[in-house]
Amino acid sequence: MRLHCLLIASVLLLSASASLADGDAKAGAQVFKKCQACHTATEPVNKVGPSLMGVVGRPVASVATYSYSPAMKAFSEGGKVWDEALLRQYLPSPQFLVKGTRMTFPGLRSSKDLDDIIAYLKNPAAAQ
């Protein structure tokens, strides 16, 4: 009985984890409109903030042509990578996770918006 409950709990946990990553890139492109004054996701061009093209899987503070804040440089120490988990920690409140960041965006509160924007950042072409 105990093993049976453990198996059911494992399946439910795996299902929930899989659904977290199932965002809609088209909806994410709409969410990204909140970001586009400072970032681009489809070109390797910096604006006020660094280009986010290829950001998912990229080391933190690694765009060579962008001048990161001391806070972001310090945050990047230890080899942090912008994976889904770290983006889910950062995007709801950038200033909370990286105290002293120059990013003034207040954050994304909706888990659906997070799912969608991550799907878009992973593959902006999927929004076409």
Question: What is each stretch, according to the model?
Answer:
Residues 1-7:
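Bacterial N-terminal signal peptides that target proteins for export
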Residues 16-17:
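N-terminal signal peptide c-region/cleavage motif recognized by signal peptidases
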Residues 23-81, 89-101, 123-128:
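Periplasmic/extracellular electron-transfer cofactor-ligation site
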Residues 25, 84, 110-111:
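Alpha-helix N-capping/helix-start residues
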Residues 106-111, 116-124:
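Short, exposed beta-strand-loop hairpins at the edges of beta-sheets
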